[in-house]
Amino acid sequence: MCGIVGYVGQKKATDILVEGLSKLEYRGYDSAGVAVLEDNKIKAEKHKGRLANLEGMLNENPIEGGIGIGHTRWATHGEPSDVNSHPHLNNKETIAVVHNGIIENYNELRNWLMEKGYEFKSETDTEVIPNLVDFYYKGDLLDAVMEATKHMEGSYAIGVICNDEPEKLVAVRKDSPLIVGLGEKEYFIASDIPAVLNHTREVYLLEDKEFVVLTNDGVTLFDEEKNPVEKEVYHITWNVDAAEKGGYEDFMLKEINEQPKAIKDTMTSRIMEEKEVTLDDISITKEYLDNVDRVYIVACGTAYHAGVIGKYAIEKLVRIPVEVDIASEFRYRDAVITDKTLIIVLSQSGETADTLAVLRDGQAKGARVLAVTNVVGSSVSREANDVLYTWAGPEIAVASTKAYVTQLIAMYTLALHFAELKGSKSVEEIEEIKKAMLELPEKVEEILKNTDLIKEFAVKASTEKDLYFLGRGMDYGVAMEGSLKLKEISYIHSEAYAGGELKHGPIALIEKDIPVISLLTQRELMDKMISNVQEVVTRGANVLGVCFKGDMEESKRKMFEGLIEIPETLSLLSPVLSVVPLQLFSYYVAKAKGFDVDKPRNLAKSVTVE
C-alpha cells in the first residue's frame, strides 16, 4: 500500500500522476514512483522519501508520454528504499506494475519464478506480479493479468502497462479499493477519489475481481471470466475545496474546526425534535431487534474508540448486551455468532482490511451487519446489510478528528433509533437526548474559541517523554482516544487508564511533574475521579482536568494545574465535547515539537492490508 494513480490520455502523464499522488499524500507513504510509456518503451523513476524528491528528478529527467502509472508506497514487505519502491518491472523491463495490498503466497510464487529463470532485485511481494504477468503474456495483456491473478493469494489493487501494448492500461482489484475516473477523452485509475477530482466527477467503483482496460478510446470492464460488465456511473458530489486546506495551516486544524458542521450534517434529517429518528438506509425492524441476543461493535484505531462509546449508549438506551472489539482480534477469536447476532462495523474509509474481513465472516455465519462509514460507495458500504453514513466530508489528515465525532453521533443516533423501535426508553427521555444532541454543534464552536489554556499546557507537555490520561465510564473511552491522538502526531509515549485501575499497577508510573490529563464529565463518578486525581497529585503529577462548567467545587480546583471547562450537556453525550480539547492538545504539542501533524511517521490514513 498506499496510493495508486494511473492515466491514459493526451496530456503529459507524469504531470497527472504526480498531481494525483499529491492528493493521496494524506494516506501516508515512505517512497514514490512513476512508470510511463514513452515511444513504446517503459521509463520509470522512483525514489525513497517525499513526493518532492520524485518531482525534482522528473524535472531533471523529463519523461514524455500519455499513458502511465504512479504509486506512493507505505512499506509492508522490505524496508523503504529506492529499489523497493513502486512501480516494479519484470526482468525484461517490458511490463510495469503498481500494487496496493499483500500477496500472501509471494514466497511460493517467487521461488517458482526463480526456477523458471526469473531474477529479483527487491524484497517486496509486488515484484512477483510483473514477472508472473510476463510468464503468462502471449500477446494479450488483459489475458496475462487475468491468468496471473488466478495464482495470487491475498489482497491487491494493481495497475499494469506493457511495451507491447503501448495504448493500454489494465487494472484489477481484490479486497483493496480502486476506482476508475471517466474524463473527457482521458481516463484514470486511483485508490481514492481525491486523486481524480481535478479532472472528473464521474467514476466507476470497481468490485472485487473486476478487471478494467483503459485506452484512448474509452474504458471496458470485465469479470474474472472475461464477460463484459455494465456498471452504473457514480457521480462525486462533494466539493474539491473540501480536500484543500482552505486557509488553515494544516488539514488537522481545519478538520478540528469543521466538526460543528460535520456533527450538524450527520444529524440533519435524522435527529429532529418531536419526530422519530429517520434512517433511510437501515431496514432493521422491531421484530428483528426483539430477536437479537447480542450486538458486537467491531472496528480499528479511532473507530474502535467510537465503538466503545457506542457500547455504553446502546446498552443504556436499548438494554441489549453489547461487546466491542478490535477487528484484528475479533476475527480470530471464534466469537459466538448466529442469526440472532447484530454486528456493527465502523470504518472511516470503508476499506479497512480487518474490518471488511469481520463483515464478510459475520455474514457467512448468519449475522446481520450494519456499517458506519464516511465514504459512499466504499467496500464496507456496498457489502453491509445496512449502512449509516457519517457526513464528515473528506478527512485528509491521518489522525482522525471529525470522522471520530461523527461516528459518535452515528452511534447515538442508532441507539435512539433502536430505543424507539423497542420502546426501551420513554418518549420524554428520548426527546431530552435529541434536544441535547441538536445543541452540540454550537457547544463545540464555543470550545474552539477558547484554546489558550490548552495551548499553554501543550507547550509545557511538549518536552515530556510520558503522559497519562485518566477517566471512568465514557470518560475512559475518550481518554483512550486522547492518548492515541497524542501518540500518533507527537510521538510522546502515552497511555490511558480507567481511574479505578490506578491502584492495580499504573500508579507506580507516577512521579514528580509527570503530566496527567483527567476527564471528569461523568457526574455520577465525579467523586471517585477526584480521589484518583488526588492520588496522582500526591505523587507529584501535574494534572489538567476537563469538566463541565460549574461542576468543580472551588476547594478542589487547587489540585489542578489547569481546568478546561466545557459547556454542559448530558453525561451520555459528553464525549462529543470532551474529546475536542484533547484533539487540540495533541495538535499543539505536535506543533510545539515541529512535527508534520497531517502526515505523521509510519502511519497510513486507510489501512487496507491485514
Curated annotation (Swiss-Prot):
Listed InterPro entries: GATase_2_dom (IPR017932), GFAT (IPR005855), GFAT_N (IPR047084), GlmS/AgaS_SIS (IPR035466), GlmS/FrlB_SIS (IPR035490), Ntn_hydrolases_N (IPR029055), SIS_dom (IPR001347), SIS_dom_sf (IPR046348)
Reactions catalysed: D-fructose 6-phosphate + L-glutamine = D-glucosamine 6-phosphate + L-glutamate
Enzyme class (EC, first level): transferase
Domain SIS: 284-424, 453-600
MF (Gene Ontology): carbohydrate derivative binding; glutamine-fructose-6-phosphate transaminase (isomerizing) activity
Function: Catalyzes the first step in hexosamine metabolism, converting fructose-6P into glucosamine-6P using glutamine as a nitrogen source.
Subunit structure: Homodimer.
Protein name (Swiss-Prot/TrEMBL): Glutamine--fructose-6-phosphate aminotransferase [isomerizing]
Source organism: Clostridium perfringens (strain 13 / Type A)
